[in-house]
Amino acid sequence: MKVTRFMFWLFSMLLPSVKSQASETEVPCNFSRRNYTLIPEGISTNVTILDLSYNRITLNAADSRVLQMYSLLTELYLMENNIIALYNSSFRNLLNLEILNICGNSISVIQQGSFVGLNELKQLFLCQNKILQLNPDTFVPLNNLKVLNLQGNLIRLFDAPQLPHLEILTLDGNPWNCTCGLLELHNWLNTSNVTLENENMTMCSYPDELKHDSIKSAPFTTECHSTFISTITEDFQSTRNSSFNSSSHNLTWTSEHEPLGKSWAFLVGVVATVLLTSLLIFIAIKCPVWYNILLSYNHHRLEEHEAETYENGLTRNPSSLSQITDTNSEDTTVIFEQLHAFVVDDDGFIEDRYIDINEVHEEK
């Protein structure tokens, strides 16, 4: 029992502090019904909730520059002003904005990049304007959008928005044309988990036979379904081809223009070092062999040159060849002089007196 009381007391003590912290983080500023034509610049930059409703603000370029000063805004209310168009990057610096209400203006044009930068936006109210058509790509930056209100405009056809977190969609009060052009939205409403607000009031205005039907339950003709299927097939093929072409183009562009990263630079350095080292080793091994081949080639060329020179000399001086031949023959001729007379013995043998004299001397 004491523990329970202590827990209640602790909770009661912490609750006021939590409320005070929340009140400290929220800084509201109410400038509604001030007859302003421009967004004031003297507001604290810490403002988180800004109400500028029921003025004469047009949200021109000057207003967009002033809005950039209030980057901490989480809620912005611009109802019942004189805004006729939303231009590209009108809210580009409001990175924390979660609620944007621009109902009750005269907006007829919404450029494709109007909501760039509103990545945290969760609720968007564009009701009671003069919007005729919307590019579905306009909502692409709104990845966290949960509530979209397009009530009371002049929209006749509308493609299914690519909003992954959308929960509530309000479309009543528009002159919907329930022909084949609206079949995609019709199928999307019946297959997605999005809740169509005021479904029984979101009625077809054309054709006459469908005026009492909701756009979600209207019976579309068989021709519309067949046309829709063929359109999906064509879109898929074109998307696949364009994706392949764009990917190949991006790959080519990247390979040609994208700077190499550190890993590529390191890899190139390693390869260059290995190639240079291999080249040096190859040169060190092959240099002696190449030197011997070059030396033998030079020696061979030298011998050929001497032989050619010798032959050329002989060809030019044939007389010298005869002289050299005569000289060589004289030098190599050996003339023996007969010092002793040979005596023919009775037995038919020739006696050499030189031998006999030597024998006599030996006997003596």
Swiss-Prot record:
InterPro entries registered for this protein in UniProt: Cys-rich_flank_reg_C, Leu-rich_rpt, Leu-rich_rpt_typical-subtyp, LRR_dom_sf
Regions of this protein lying in the Extracellular compartment: 21-264
GO BP term, pick one: positive regulation of non-canonical NF-kappaB signal transduction
Mutant lacking the gene: phenotype: Knockout mice display increased longevity compared with the cohoused wild-type littermates. Almost all mutant mice remain alive, whereas most of the wild-type mice (>80%) di after 2 years on standard chow. Mutant body weights are lower than those of wild-type. Gut tissues of wild-type mice show slight inflammation whereas mutant mouse gut tissues do not. The gut tissues of mutant mice are more yellow and the colon tissues are thinner in mutant mice than in WT mice and the ceca are enlarged significantly.
Keyword Transport: no
Activity regulation (record text): Activated by TLR ligands such as LPS, bacterial DNA and peptidoglycan.
Keyword RNA-binding appears in the UniProt entry: no
Membrane-spanning ranges: 265-285
LRR repeats: 44-69, 70-93, 94-117, 118-141, 143-163, 164-190
Domain LRRCT: 174-225
Function: Pathogen-recognition receptor which mediates the activation of TRAF2- and TRAF6 NF-kappa-B signaling pathways and induces the expression of pro-inflammatory cytokines. In kidney, prevents infection by uropathogenic bacteria by inducing the production of cytokines, chemokines and antimicrobial substances. In gut, involved in host-microbiota interactions, plays a critical role in promoting the recruitment of immune cells and intestinal inflammation.
Name of the molecule in the record: Leucine-rich repeat-containing protein 19
Source organism: Mus musculus (Mouse)
Gene name as annotated: Lrrc19
